UniProtKB/Swiss-Prot annotation:
It is a peripheral membrane protein. The modification Phosphoserine is found at residues 52, 66, 72, 75, 80, 430, 767. GO terms for cellular component: centrosome; nuclear envelope; nuclear membrane; nuclear periphery; nuclear pore. Part of the nuclear pore complex (NPC). Component of the p62 complex, a complex composed of NUP62 and NUP54. Forms a complex with NUP35, NUP155, NUP205 and lamin B; the interaction with NUP35 is direct. Does not interact with TPR. Interacts with SMAD4 and IPO7; translocates SMAD4 to the nucleus through the NPC upon BMP7 stimulation resulting in activation of SMAD4 signaling. The lineage of its organism: Eukaryota, Metazoa, Chordata, Craniata, Vertebrata. It is found in: Nucleus membrane; Nucleus, Nuclear pore complex; Nucleus envelope. It comes from Bos taurus. GO terms for molecular function: structural constituent of nuclear pore. Keywords: Membrane, mRNA transport, Nuclear pore complex, Nucleus, Phosphoprotein, Protein transport, Translocation, Transport. This is Nuclear pore complex protein Nup93. Plays a role in the nuclear pore complex (NPC) assembly and/or maintenance. May anchor nucleoporins, but not NUP153 and TPR, to the NPC. During renal development, regulates podocyte migration and proliferation through SMAD4 signaling. InterPro entries: Nucleoporin_int_Nup93/Nic96.
Length: 819
């Protein structure tokens, strides 16, 4: 038959070739072997495409058919579905067709509502996604910023420095990361907070911190003396620190305090110099500033300098005596010199008396203009540097002249310029006779800067320059960048913060030192929260108690999301140090809570514990989170997390000190305590928790070989059917179980089937019949076991849950072996 078919096909091909050759109009095409191969490949690919589609259909039929699904029926249903009737354009209706009009209006309203709901849903999803991204990015920014070494350009300065990073390696466990000075500061902070939380009178934090200074470190002692002097001001009532700090009264007070500090320091310097050279100083006469300055000049100016004018008083130049008396802050002593030499000084005595008796050391405008005119005409190029300096101070003129012959040290330069600072803008002063505090601050911070003051060799000098010009934030930020001086900078910031003198950044993502829009040009803000968190990061893992004391200063601060910074820092501290019991307290066996360190700072600890528990939960630390929620009496969250922890370990074999044994004991302890105290949680979560405990007991009995006890447990739980009549009931009940129960279904089914199969083998292994067990009883039991196995198979096939193919195969295999 096949031979005849091929012969007929050959005959037709030859006939077709003959007919084609007979047509002369058509050109004759000859193909080479490569072209024939390509054409064959094209035909083959078409055939394979059709064949592969058919093969895929066959495979789909086999796969779905094994689950009881008819693929042809599904295909027909899918083809019959059409969206045309739902979204097709509405048919036009006549004006008089009321029914059609109403139907169209109804359909239009439905479609509009659906479209509006769709747009609103997508919009809400986009908004939620955007907010989530912003919050996450804000957290990432915080972590990045907290690792930067400094603010501004210094943050990206890669020059070699000997200073270590903020984040130093933690020492061995149990060893403090605080050095002796830092520990001494921490003790004073503890004393301060103890007074605050106990409701006592607020102590002076500045005095507490100043008591820490090392006896042999004069720089630190001088620093705290300067801080005490500069903060001893009366603040004007204002809504915030910026308005208070920017008021004219407070700025004038800062300048007065700075001058007082510089004058007292210089007087102390002259005392030390004189008493160190008593023979040369020839100290004598009535004790006081005048005699002190006279003796000091015996050392400083042993021989008269050329160019000094207006004679001498007791062998010393007049203007030098006046200048150094003023430099020591004693205008009465300077007045004494003026009175002795009044005949050589002309009108100066009158001007000096007015200057000395004025409230703000300021001449009247008329007198000031007269003195300035005299200075410009007769004294600008005078050869006596002391005379020029005194006139520039009293008349506040020629501010561009630094008087370097007299003010040869930084402290002298500061004193001279602060004396020339003016606050009232009468509009009559020329630029060379006017120096504002803002101009002077800008000159020191931006024009001169750190490079001018050789900060690596003299860090305290630059700190002093900034602090005495009321640039507290810039001074603190500078000192904080030096590892060995960081603790001092932090505690100066704490003192200013408590005195309401610190200008804080409005957001925690700002640099350590920043300038915000709307602030005066010379004003800088300090990121106080970041400063404190960077400082505590060094020791929070080894000294969490001390870190907590510092975080208490943030109790009224909030982050960009409005979250309390004290709560946030405590939660991060607890997670980082894992000192849950010590900081937050511990739950005793009777359910009472043993107080922790946090109880000293607040009477209501639940919000803090719940916050820490939430952070632990978000980090995946479910076991710690469950304990913390238990500490906060949040039963719903405790059982919810315990369900997540218990679900994976339910079918595991128990072993001493294993993960399952630990979690089981923890769960049993919670269950016993909740039942004894009558604590209940959400009904669904509660029932899941106790069902998981029962399943753990079931598997423990099963793995121990106590199959009869295990069978009794699974029978009482009513989780799987053990007869055909209860299959549908169990399938319906299965829909109400949580995922924690469903995930263990495969193991429960296999264990139950194994129990039935073991009982079946044991039944078959007994003698055929006996007086106590007749043959009929054995047959009934055999039938019952097979029926129970069949019920399990039916249940596994009907539940709306995908079990593994291996589970189904093993279930079927054991059921077949029983038959």
């Amino acid at each position: 038959m096949d031979t005849e078919g091929f012969g007929e096909l050959l005959q037709q091909a030859e006939q077709l070739a003959a007919e084609t050759e007979g047509i002369s109009e058509l050109p004759h095409v000859e193909r080479n072997l490569q072209e024939i191969q390509q054409a064959g490949e094209r035909l083959r690919s078409r055939t394979l495409t059709r064949t592969s589609q058919e093969t895929a259909d066959v495979k789909a039929s086999v796969l779905l058919g094994s689950r009881g699904l008819d693929i042809s029926h599904i295909s027909q249903r899918l083809e019959s579905l059409s969206a045309a009737t739902t979204f097709e354009p509405l048919e036009p209706v006549k004006d008089t067709d009321i029914q059609g009009f109403l139907k169209n209006e109804k359909d239009n309203a439905l479609l509009s509502a659906i479209e509006e709901s769709r747009k609103r849903t997508f919009g809400m999803a986009e908004e939620y996604h955007r907010e989530s991204m912003l919050v996450e990015w804000e957290q990432v920014k915080q972590r990045i910023l907290h690792t930067l070494l400094a603010s501004g350009e210094d943050a990206l300065d890669f020059t070699q420095e000997s200073e270590p990073s903020y984040i130093s390696d933690a020492g061995p466990p149990g060893r403090s990361s605080l050095d002796s000075i830092e520990m001494a500061y921490a003790r004073q902070i503890y004393i301060y907070n103890e007074k605050i939380v106990n409701g006592h009178l607020q102590p002076n934090l500045l005095d507490l911190c100043a008591s820490v200074t090392e006896l042999d470190d004069k720089n630190i002692s001088d620093m705290w003396a300067m801080v005490k002097q500069m903060t001893d001001v009366l603040l004007v009532p204002a809504t915030d620190a910026l308005k208070s700090r920017n008021s004219v009264e407070v700025r004038m007070e800062f300048v007065r305090q700075a001058l007082g500090y510089l004058e007292q320091s210089y007087k102390n310097y002259t005392l030390v110099t004189v008493f160190g050279n008593l023979h040369q100083a020839q100290l004598g006469g009535v004790p006081g500033t005048y005699q002190l300055v006279r003796s000091f000049l015996n050392i400083k100016l042993p021989a008269p300098l050329p160019g000094l004018q207006d004679g001498e008083v007791e062998g010393h130049p007049v203007w030098a005596l006046i200048y150094y008396c003023m430099r020591c802050g004693d205008l009465l002593a300077a007045s004494q010199v003026v009175n002795r030499a009044q005949h050589q000084l002309g009108e100066f005595k009158t001007w000096f008396q007015e200057y000395m008796n004025s409230k703000d050391r300021r001449l009247s405008p008329a007198t000031e203009n007269k003195l300035r005119l005299h200075y410009r005409r007769a004294l600008r190029n005078n050869t006596d540097p002391y005379k020029r300096a005194v006139y520039c101070i009293i008349g506040r003129c020629d501010v561009t002249d630094n008087q370097s012959e007299v003010a040869d040290k930084t402290e002298d330069y500061l004193w001279l310029k602060l004396n020339q600072v003016c606050f009232d803008d009468d509009g009559t002063s020329s630029p060379q006779d006017r120096l504002t505090l803002s101009q002077f601050q800008k000159q020191l911070l931006e024009d001169y800067g750190e490079s001018h003051f050789t900060v690596n060799q003299q860090p305290f000098l630059y700190f002093q320059v900034l602090f005495l010009t009321a640039q507290f934030e810039a001074a603190i930020a500078f000192l904080f960048r030096m590892e060995r001086l960081r603790c001092h900078a932090v505690h100066v910031a704490l003192v200013l913060f408590e005195l309401k003198l610190l200008l804080k950044s409005s957001g925690q993502s700002a640099q350590l030192l920043s300038h915000e829009p709307g602030d005066p040009p010379c004003m800088r803000r300090l990121n106080f929260v970041r400063l404190l968190m960077l400082y505590t990061r060094k020791f929070e893992s080894t000294d969490p108690r001390e870190a907590l004391q510092y975080f208490y200063f943030l109790r009224d601060e909030k982050d960009s999301q409005g979250e309390n910074m004290f709560l946030r820092c405590v939660s991060e501290l607890v997670i980082e140090s894992r000192e849950f019991d010590m900081i937050l307290g511990k739950l005793e066996n009777d359910g009472s809570r043993k107080p922790g360190v946090i109880d000293k700072f607040t009477s209501d600890t639940k919000p803090i514990i719940n916050k820490v528990a939430s952070v632990a939960e978000n980090k995946g630390l479910f076991e710690e989170a469950a304990k913390l929620y238990d500490l906060a009496k949040n039963a719903d969250k405790v059982l919810e997390l315990m369900n997540k922890l218990l679900s994976p370990i339910v079918p595991q074999i128990s072993a001493p000190q294993s993960n399952k044994e630990r979690l089981k004991n923890m769960a049993l302890s919670i269950a016993e305590r909740y039942r004894a105290q009558g604590i209940s949680a959400n009904k669904f979560v509660d029932s899941t928790f106790y069902l998981l405990l029962d399943l753990i007991t079931f598997f423990d009995e099963y793995h121990s070989g106590h199959i009869d006890r295990a069978f009794d447990i699974i029978d009482r739980l009513k989780l799987v059917p053990l007869n055909q009549e209860s299959v549908e009931e169990r399938v319906a009940a299965f829909r109400n179980f949580s995922d924690e129960i469903r995930h263990n279904l495969s193991e429960v089914l296999l264990a139950t089937m194994n129990i039935l199969f073991t009982q079946f083998k044991r039944l078959k292994g007994t003698s055929p019949s006996s007086a106590t067990r007749p043959q009929r009883v054995i047959e009934d039991r055999d039938s019952q076991l097979r029926s129970q196995a069949r019920a399990l198979i039916t249940f596994a096939g009907m539940i709306p849950y995908r079990t593994s193919g291996d589970t189904n195969a093993r279930l079927v295999q054991m059921e077949v072996l029983m038959n």
